[in-house]
């Protein structure tokens, strides 16, 4: 069905259709500034800006032998002094990490051994390409890359992995290509997703933090070796980085004043002078009004992205909470209108859209298609005393997401049992718009779980969403290492192939559990799967053990640490060691839950219980990728499936979850010193993970994507969306602590949620999600015909936004494989 013949369209589809037909966007008149800003980079391929990498490298060359945290701070000061600053036409906020338009920056300390490959391949690679000028490419190869050869974190990790771990991790000796079996993720980002305490900066400013560091420095014990060798460098680094961000801001103020002197338009002249005044005051000092609060937060966010690759996944935190006092004050004083406040927020949204989180390694690129971004803004939730926290700014941000024609920022709405009807209605109306916002995160699951891990109720109630589905507690979270992604569908294949995989030939990768044709009982098959499963978990935990040992030698985060209460209290950088009083929330990802559950259910039911299929014939059909075995495939696809509230399948899923969580309970704290929780959050990696797995016993064909997150297999959820929620609930072991996020994707047709009745149904569905204590759910509201049409004519559908993993992206920026994956997801037309 083509878009032009759809009986019912989402508002996004209608907006897109209006543009195709040449009609003006109805929001252009109310958002003229933002539309002008957007049109300057619409459809633009990102450009790599090398200044951050160049100045960081220059400084690190000069400071060898000094404590790493001090070197990092000095590098940030060198960047702050020398990096080009910009004042964009029409913008009301100052601060960029790179050039005009869409841009990305490089972090050579992380994966600089990929730089030669990156500058060669980035412009032409199929997923998330970027441009780089010939001169910048030359400087990368000649001035930046040589220094980092042999010094990068990725090289150190690759060398440290034992052979039995390496063979399940990488497909080459240098560790450039992943095997997509047990995949480490720490080498293409400096840290997992993070949330800063922005409220602290708005209320205190960096000059106050510098003063605190100076006082702590003066109070150190002059006879203590630890104070001298560890605390002193940390505090000196904090003082330097506080000066660096203030200097960087003031350089923007100078440029804004220079531009104001030349500006002939009196309105723009006044804006530039006010922007200069803002940058002279914040983020060094406390914000005095809403505009300064936005500017202070934006400087902080952008300098965090300059600091390290954590910054590319820096969450915006609970923006409706920490901005609300400034918004309320200015509204009551008549200093700002709702439209002016929205314009400031949307200037920030534009800045987020221009910064592209570039993954230069082949594996990182495969994991994060469509220029993945996780700068989540969290709205709603609860106050420290447990009351509903929604306010005027909550509704303004939701309204902006319905009117702002871009997939930035990512938006997360916290849901709890006492959420007011007005809030849920606005959330539902925003979901119905069709661009995938907001994703929903459930207080009823997260708050008690975090209390069980050691948080106070007040701390747990103040969590903010970060990354795809993560929940972070500012000033209590202290763990930064990325976790492993584990392809458990490969474990099923290894049972069928005696520890081997078709993709990798005769190499023994897993446990030799025997020829499955010799198995006479389901228990034998199940136990063989458990052996492979446990090997994968041990491999992941071994990776994490080594990662934890290496990170302190390669990373420091003086600015992020300066904003963290516990880091300042104990004078410890976030990357250096376990921080006293912190809660270390790590994770490993279960890839392919639906694929594995359905495969095991089919084997149990059809081979061992009903004996409708022999193991020999099953393996022959899988080896043939079901060609000539269409009857076998049809039989397999008729077996019980996860996502249908079918206890037969769901019980297997619950057992799988229990094995993973119990392993974590046993070894996380003893071996790693962290809560290494099981999660089901694939980003876009279920596509490349599926490419290495041959056909599976659920009827999935060779190379087809695995099921994503905690969602059902493609087309397997035939009993409606509520059954999907119920399966998600019943496969979770509620009584076990070391568990975390479950990403759940659901696709509705616009007709399903049409009108007020559709909104009422969606609100009811959200309340069911909340009552079942599920972690996360997100929606696509789009017609399949629109997606198919966009594949055929990508230029015409350039602005079509879809929900992918924990973020939204332009559909046409996705690979054909990921586009097809989205199209193949079950489309629910009733609720």
UniProtKB/Swiss-Prot annotation:
Keywords carried by this UniProt record: Lyase, Organic radical, Pyruvate
SUPFAM superfamilies: PFL-like glycyl radical enzymes
Any one GO MF annotation of this record: lyase activity
Biological process, per Gene Ontology: alkanesulfonate catabolic process
Modified-residue entries (Glycine radical), positions: 806
Induction cue: Highly up-regulated in the presence of isethionate.
Pathways per UniProt: Organosulfur degradation; alkanesulfonate degradation
Domain PFL: 32-701
GO cellular-component term (any): cytosol
Top enzyme category: lyase
Post-translational modification: Requires the activating protein IslB to generate the key active site glycyl radical on Gly-806 that is involved in catalysis.
Record domain Glycine radical: where: 708-831
Enzyme Commission no: 4.4.1.38
Catalytic activity as recorded in UniProt: 2-hydroxyethane-1-sulfonate = acetaldehyde + sulfite + H(+)
Binding site for 2-hydroxyethane-1-sulfonate: 189, 193, 468-470, 679
Subunit structure, interactors included: Homodimer.
Similarity annotation: Belongs to the glycyl radical enzyme (GRE) family.
Protein name, per record: Isethionate sulfite-lyase
Organism the protein comes from: Desulfovibrio desulfuricans (strain ATCC 27774 / DSM 6949 / MB)
Gene that this sequence comes from: islA
């Amino acid at each position: 069905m083509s878009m032009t013949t759809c009986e019912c369209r989402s508002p996004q589809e209608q907006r897109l259709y209006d543009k195709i037909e040449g009609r003006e966007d109805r929001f252009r008149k109310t958002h003229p500034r933002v539309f002008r800003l957007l049109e300057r980079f619409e459809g633009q391929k990102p450009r790599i800006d090398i200044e951050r990498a160049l100045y960081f490298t220059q400084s690190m060359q000069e400071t060898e032998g000094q404590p790493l945290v001090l070197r990092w701070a000095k590098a940030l000061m060198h960047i702050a002094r020398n990096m080009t600053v910009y004042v964009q036409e029409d913008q009301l906020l100052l601060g960029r990490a790179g050039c005009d338009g869409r841009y990305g920056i490089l972090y050579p300390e992380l994966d600089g051994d990929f730089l030669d490959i990156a500058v060669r391949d980035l412009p032409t690679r199929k997923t998330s390409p970027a441009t780089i000028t010939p001169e910048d490419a030359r400087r990368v190869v000649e001035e930046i890359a040589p220094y980092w050869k042999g010094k990068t974190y990725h090289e150190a990790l690759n060398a440290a992995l034992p052979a039995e771990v390496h063979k399940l991790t990488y497909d080459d000796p240098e560790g450039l290509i992943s095997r997509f079996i047990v995949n480490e993720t720490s080498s293409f980002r400096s840290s997992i997703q993070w949330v800063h305490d922005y409220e602290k900066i708005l209320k205190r400013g960096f000059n106050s933090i510098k003063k605190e560091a100076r006082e702590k420095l003066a109070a150190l014990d002059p006879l203590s070796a630890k104070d001298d060798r560890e605390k002193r460098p940390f505090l000196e680094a904090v003082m330097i980085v506080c000066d660096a961000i203030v200097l960087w801001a003031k350089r923007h103020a100078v440029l804004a004043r220079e531009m104001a002197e030349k500006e002939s338009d009196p309105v723009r002249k006044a804006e530039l002078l006010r922007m200069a005044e803002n940058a002279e005051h914040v983020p060094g000092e406390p914000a005095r009004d809403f505009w300064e609060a936005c500017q202070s937060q934006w400087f902080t966010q952008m300098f965090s992205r300059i600091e390290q690759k954590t910054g590319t996944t820096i969450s915006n935190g609970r923006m409706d909470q920490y901005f609300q006092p400034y918004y309320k004050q200015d509204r009551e004083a008549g200093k700002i209108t709702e439209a002016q406040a929205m314009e400031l927020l949307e200037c920030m949204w534009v800045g987020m859209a221009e910064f592209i989180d570039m993954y230069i390694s082949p594996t990182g690129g495969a994991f994060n298609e469509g220029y993945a971004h996780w700068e989540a803004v969290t709205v709603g939730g609860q106050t420290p005393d447990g009351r509903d926290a929604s306010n005027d700014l909550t509704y303004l941000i939701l309204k902006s997401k319905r009117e702002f024609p871009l997939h930035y920022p990512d938006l997360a709405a916290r849901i709890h049992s006492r959420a007011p009807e007005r809030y849920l209605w606005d959330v539902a109306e925003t979901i119905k718009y069709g661009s995938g916002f907001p994703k929903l995160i459930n207080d009823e699951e997260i708050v008690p779980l975090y209390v069980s891990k050691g948080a106070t109720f007040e701390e747990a109630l103040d969590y903010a969403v970060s990354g795809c589905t993560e929940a972070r507690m500012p000033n209590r979270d202290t763990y930064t290492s990325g976790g492993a992604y584990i392809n458990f569908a490969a474990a099923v294949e290894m049972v069928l192939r005696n520890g081997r995989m078709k993709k990798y030939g005769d190499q023994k990768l897993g446990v030799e559990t025997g020829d499955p044709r010799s198995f006479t009982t389901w228990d034998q098959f199940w136990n063989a799967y458990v052996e492979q499963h446990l090997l994968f978990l041990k491999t992941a935990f071994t990776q994490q053990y080594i990662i934890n040992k290496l990170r302190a030698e390669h990373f420091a985060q003086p600015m992020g640490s300066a904003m963290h209460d516990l880091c300042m209290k104990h004078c410890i950088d976030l990357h250096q060691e376990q921080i006293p009083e912190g809660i270390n929330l790590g994770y490993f990802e279960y890839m392919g839950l639906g694929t594995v559950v359905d495969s095991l259910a089919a084997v149990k039911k059809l081979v061992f219980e009903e004996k409708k299929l022999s193991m020999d014939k099953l393996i022959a059909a899988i080896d043939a990728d079901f060609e000539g075995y269409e009857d076998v495939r049809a039989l397999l696809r008729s077996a019980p499936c996860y996502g249908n509230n079918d206890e037969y399948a769901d019980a297997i899923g619950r057992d799988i979850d229990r094995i993973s969580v119990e392993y974590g309970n046993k070894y996380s704290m003893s071996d790693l010193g962290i809560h290494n929780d099981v999660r089901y959050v694939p980003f876009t990696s279920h596509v490349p993970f599926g490419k290495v797995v041959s056909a599976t016993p659920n009827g999935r064909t060779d190379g087809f994507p695995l099921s994503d997150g905690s969602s059902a297999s493609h087309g397997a959820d035939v009993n409606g969306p509520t059954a999907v929620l119920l399966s998600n609930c019943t496969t979770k072991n509620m009584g076990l602590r070391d568990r975390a996020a479950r990403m759940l994707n659901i696709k509705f047709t616009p007709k399903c949620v049409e009108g007020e009745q559709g909104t009422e149904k969606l609100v009811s569905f959200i309340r069911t999600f909340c009552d079942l204590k599920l972690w996360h759910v997100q929606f696509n509201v789009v017609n399949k015909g629109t997606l198919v049409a966009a594949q055929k004519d990508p230029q015409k559908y350039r602005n079509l936004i879809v929900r992918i993993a924990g973020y939204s992206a332009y559909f046409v920026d996705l690979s054909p494989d990921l586009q097809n994956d989205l199209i193949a997801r079950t489309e629910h037309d009733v609720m």
